[in-house]
Regions:
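Short aromatic-enriched loop/helix-cap "lid" or pocket-rim segments at secondary-structure transitions
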Residues: 17-18, 88, 146, 156-158
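Residue-level signal for well-ordered alpha-helical positions
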Residues: 62-63, 114-115, 138
């Protein structure tokens, strides 16, 4: 099973009428470039989860069009910025298909540290907006196969 952890794309600095921060134009373009890259690499997932916050949901929507066409997006609890990683760590134990989770920092950095070092306080990776990380489980060990930041996919033409 592969687990794709995604930090939402760059959001507007100010909140909209509903009190949420939508993706900025740059954020949308970056996530679209990431989606094209993932599609070209053959990435497909059977589940996409998001935090419920607008910017994470928008990120999931853009990605799902190419890596999970027809798959319904699902909100998952306890993955907002300051949440503890324990809940998601427990949830992924029962997953057996390639899955994507769209969320926020510092949660995504702490979750990556937990998967790689067994400790969410370890300093393992820096996750910029729009970053996609691919983890794979071998026996009881998670490894990071790769990590792609938007500046690498922005200008690629397919």
């Amino acid at each position: 099973m592969k687990l794709y952890l995604v930090r939402h794309g760059k959001a507007e600095d100010s909140v909209d009428a509903s009190g949420e921060r939508p993706l900025s134009q740059r954020g949308m373009a970056d996530v679209e470039a990431q989606a094209k890259f993932l599609d070209n690499a053959g990435v497909r997932v059977t589940n996409i989860y998001h935090s419920g916050k607008l910017r994470a949901r928008q990120t999931a929507e853009i990605l799902s069009a190419l890596v999970a066409p027809g798959v319904a997006l699902q909100k998952i609890d306890n993955i907002t910025p300051m949440d503890d990683t324990t809940y998601l760590a427990q949830q992924i134990q029962s997953w057996n298909t390639d899955t994507m989770v769209c969320g926020h920092n510092p949660f995504m950095e702490r979750m990556a540290a937990r998967l790689l070092a067994g400790n969410d306080e370890a300093s393992a990776v820096m996750v910029k907006t729009g970053t996609v990380m691919c983890f794979e489980k071998f026996s009881d060990t998670w490894v990071m196969n790769w990590m792609v930041v938007p500046c690498l996919t922005r200008d690629i033409e397919y």
